[in-house]
Amino acid sequence: KELTPEIKKIVDKVNAMDLEEQKKLLREYGAIEKPEKIEKDKMPELKNSKNVVVRFAPNPNGAISFGHCRPALWNWFIKGHYTGKYLLRFDDTDPQVKPPIKEAYSWFKDDLKWLGIKPSKIIIQSKRLKKYYKYAQELINIGGAYVCTCNSEKKRELLHKSIKCPCVDKYQTDRWKWMFDGTYKAGEAVLRIKTDINAPNPALRDWAAFRIVSENKHPLDSKSVVWPLLNFASAIDDHDFKVTHIVRGVDLQVSDD
């Protein structure tokens, strides 16, 4: 507001000049270059774009945020571009640290509808625990998973030094059952996926897949005590529901490994 009179004075002065004077000043001060027309970014062509299936997978432990809206819409645009399927999957398997809110399931559905997003299918992970247990048992049967009872400090040292865990060679079927029947308490045992103990990234070495929960605050399932961690449940669901492409932040890039 304060600059308006000054700007008007300068404009009037320039307008009072003849064309040659204006050109001379333009040469002295340099012309303002007109920016080149920038084409809008086009969606990159995806590999294996036949029968595209994408998923938006929030934890319903609160209302939808702008951070949620971005991947929700990205996936929706991909689904629309390739005439694929869009899955809304509630990653609600943390009933203790980040327990879901019962009303939040509806909040997400309503807000996605407001954004113009219509999921092809809705999946609730907490209702698929038996499926996750089944896959876990199959992995145990083939030696692909084991129940670890090492304390966190000892386990950290073993993984850091790429040393085989002594729990690997123990009879796993009983140890897995003991996670459910109360023999093991929360923090005393976890089921781990057996991987390459020499993997360059320590986070990928024998990672935890299931843990025992002592304080279950889940609004849909308050009785279960053994719960899958995100990476395990997510991998199973991506496989079962034939997810073809995943849009996620750099912070989750390690999941690709």
Enumerate the predicted regions with their spans.
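N-terminal Rossmann-like or analogous alpha/beta NTP/dinucleotide-binding catalytic cores
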Residues: K1-P166, D251-D257
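Active-site cores that bind ATP or allylic diphosphates and position pyrophosphate for catalysis
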Residues: E138-D257
